[in-house]
Every structure is written in structure tokens, then in C-alpha cells.
Amino acid sequence: MSTDLRSRVLTEHNVSRETAQALDLYVAQLTRWQTVKNLVGPATLSEVWQRHVADALQLLTIAPEARRWLDLGSGAGIPGLILAIAGRGRSGFHVELVESNARKCAFLSETARLTGAPVTVHNARIEAVIGHRSGIDIVCARALAPLTQLLAWSEPLLTSGTVGLFPKGRDAAAELTEAEDAWTFTRDLIPSRTDSQARIVRVTSLSRVDP
């Protein structure tokens, strides 16, 4: 079953043989490290190609021209490390991964080295990194925090032309309503290709609501 899912995901996203091999390495690494460090929900490993790989790859279809990405709370490298693996052959493509947990950073660094993924791993808190970044096309985060908090962390970038892409589950609309109490922004709710109840929130032109 997982082989069928793998083939379908690779076909849908027009993945080259070399990139497919690198994604196989990522999945093998994730499976190996999962035994010592709980990187993803154990029940999701059997559906890793749909739940994690395809879920990350769909962001490239939303922002195909983006070259510089910043992934907040990277954890198991979803979506950031997967995006970097898929973008290896693109000129200037680079993903910065921000993760405060040292063991997870070890996983990210080792897997990036094995797959040749163009990444920089920041073993630091988001607040210590994000204010010093510039030239970022996309800031993203999955399963990290409510949208209001993601916007607060991303404010230095989203007020300077960067686009936010934040995958959300069935509570996306409620999180948007809460965020709009504190922030003004342009947004799109993009249906997820991997979960009919999920959405990807695209955010631009962020500013704070006047008190």
C-alpha cells in the first residue's frame, strides 16, 4: 500500500528519479530516527508519503517561483527539509530550518547531508532568528502554533514583502477569525490536496490592528 502511495505522489508532483531517491533516503532516515526520537505521530508513518511528503510538496505548487524559504519549528523537516530536497536542482533554492530542539536539529543536519538538500539549520528559538533574516520569499510552518502566534513570529518578514504559507486543519477558519482581531492582512484559503478538510493559509501585507 505504501508503495502505491509513493508512486502516486511521485507521479503527481513530477518528481525526478534523483529526487525520488533523495526522498526515499528522507523516509528511511525518518523511520530510523523515529525509534529514538518521536519526530512524527507513530500512526502516520504508514502513510508517510501522503501525510508528510505530499503535504509538503504541495507548497511548491502554490509558490513555484519562490527560491528562499524559512521554515519555523522544523521538527521532522516537514515541510522545510522535504521542500529543500525537491528544490535541489533549482538555481538559488535554499531553505532555512529553525528548530530549538538539538536532537531534532541533529536529524535535520544528518538527513540534509545525506540527501544533498540545500539548507541551513538554526538550532535556536524563532525569536532569535527571524528578526535577522532578509530576502526571504516564503515563511512557512506546519503543526506548530495557532495562526495568531505564527503571524506574531513572522511579523518582521510579513510586513516586508515575504509571503506566509501556513498549512492548517479543519480549524483554519476559526484561527483566521481569531487572528483578524489582532492583525490586518490579505489572505487566501487554499484547499489542501492531501486532506479535504485542511487548508493552506496564504498571508501577505501584514499589519497590526490599531488599539
Curated annotation (Swiss-Prot):
The keyword Methyltransferase applies. Disulfide bonds: none annotated. It is found in: Cytoplasm. Its EC number is 2.1.1.170. S-adenosyl-L-methionine binds at residues 73, 126-127, 142. One of its GO terms (cellular component) is cytosol. Keywords: Cytoplasm, Methyltransferase, rRNA processing, S-adenosyl-L-methionine, Transferase. HAMAP family: 16SrRNA_methyltr_G. Specifically methylates the N7 position of guanine in position 527 of 16S rRNA. This is Ribosomal RNA small subunit methyltransferase G. It comes from Methylorubrum populi (strain ATCC BAA-705 / NCIMB 13946 / BJ001).
